[in-house]
Amino acid sequence: MKKAIVIGASSGIGKELARLLVKNGYIVGITGRRKNLLIDLKNENPDKYFIGSFDLTDTYNIKTNLESLVRQLDGVDLLIISSGTGDTNDRLDFEIEKRTIEVNVTGFTAVCDWAFNYFAGQKTGHIVGITSVAGLRGSRHAPSYNATKAYQINYLEGLHQKVKKLKSRLFVTDIRPGFVNTDMAKGDGLFW
């Protein structure tokens, strides 16, 4: 049976991807900060979901948390990173920028590095990053969001280049949605 982990499955794109994976025969490890929302998702199909609730800003424990989830799943073939944060920040409140960087850069990198090393060790696997077209341009309304998405795009490209040097069945995919009607896209929707 195919096994996947979806980082950021408590809402939005990640939640819908987890549902699609289950519909297509996967067993899915779901992660997010809001455990109650993960439990609600698990209750839709209790035998197909495994919960690993944690915060990406806790990079010290990401490896332990992911390894625990992999043990529950008895392996993993696909890891989708769909977590992220971004707020409009016209006043340039540094705390908003810092939180965006901690999740979208630091946490993202910790998950990517773990996944890359795990899949390289088993010589097969697929890392999918849900980035954004917002990473292609700056934004006066959400400067750190767009900048962190640019980082993700470039980081995944770097991992893709590393994969070419390996003799394995390891894949890296960057998916760049445009504006999507999710809870994160709140406010006036002026990311771009």
What name fits each language-model region?
Residues N154, Q161-W192:
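SDR active-site lid
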Residues C112, T148:
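Active-site helix of classical SDR
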Residues I80-T88:
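Conserved NAD(P)H cofactor-binding loop of Rossmann-fold oxidoreductase domains
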Residues N89-E102:
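Short alpha-helical oligomerization interface
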Residues S10-S11:
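Conserved glycine-rich cofactor-binding loop
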Residues N24-D40:
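Conserved glycine-rich Rossmann-like NAD(P)H-binding loop of the short-chain dehydrogenase/reductase
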Residues S132:
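Residue(s) in the substrate-gating loop at a strand-loop-helix junction
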